[in-house]
Amino acid sequence: MEIIKKSSDELTMKQMYDLTKSPEIQKVSDNDGALLQVDAWALYKDTDKDGNTREILSILDNEAGAIATNSATFTRDFMEIIEMCLDCGAEVQHVKISSGTSKAGRKFYTCVYVD
């Protein structure tokens, strides 16, 4: 596992475990419409069971637990929200998981900035 970016350099061991290794990590696709409090997050590379390297975004909500995805759309949109918050001197507090259907008819997931 290789950490690409994370919400803070001061994440605890428990937060890093919850974000990256916990068997209780939930899928974004199982939480469509959910409002997440962004207590911590990590973007990292991991290897799947077939040996393929995947980029995974994991968001920790201290109430709901960690929710992760390898969706490029969700990850891109979340990281754009993070960058916009940094540019404005703000911190992202909440995002909503949202879904849509692509032109090809496939379901995709993204996130919406709430506050």
What are these regions (language model features)?
Residues M1-A64, A104, Y113-D115:
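OB-fold ssDNA-binding interfaces and closely related basic DNA-contact patches used
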Residues D18, K45, T75, M79, ...:
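Compositionally biased, intrinsically disordered low-complexity regions enriched in proline and serine
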Residues S29-N31, R76-K96:
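Short nucleic-acid-contacting surface segments enriched for D/E, G, S/T with interspersed K/R
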Residues E63-F78, I82-E83:
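Disulfide-stabilized netrin-like
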Residues C88, K96-D115:
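Short, charged beta-turn/beta-strand-edge "cap" motif at the junction between a beta-strand
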